[in-house]
Amino acid sequence: MKIKGVVRDDDSIIFYKNDEVFIYMTRKTKWGGRVYGQIYNANDELLLKVKSFLWLGIKITYQNLGLPISNVSFYLYDRFALGKKDKLEILNLLIYCRLYWNNACIADVKPINLLKYNTHLEINFNTKDELKIYYSTILFCTTVLYADLY
């Protein structure tokens, strides 16, 4: 399963599944390097609100996902606890990322079409579990708050 992401001119990031909008994030920058993001599903339902100050970490300030999520963020690594038994870890290796669900690699993220004006990403999932794809895409979205902003 491939999910494609595009950073648009209005600073939003849209993720497409089968060429249809799957998840999108609007972003606002504030003075001093703060970035606020709101993540929505294809039905325009607000799923998460996040804020960050430069690369010091991401804080989830609102969630509407049906299960509690907590996170720990570092510069190259993000870890999310989903409910009581699952965890998602995102390892950022410069322009490539790898997603781990309960210590098993479920996806690689890489930039594509580097010669185009906007940044294009591709998440290559090696799982068919729709819930893992859904939650992983939403939480990966929180880690790209700064993509193409500076």
What residue spans do the PLM features occupy?
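Intrinsically disordered, low-complexity proline/glycine-rich segments
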Residues: 1-150
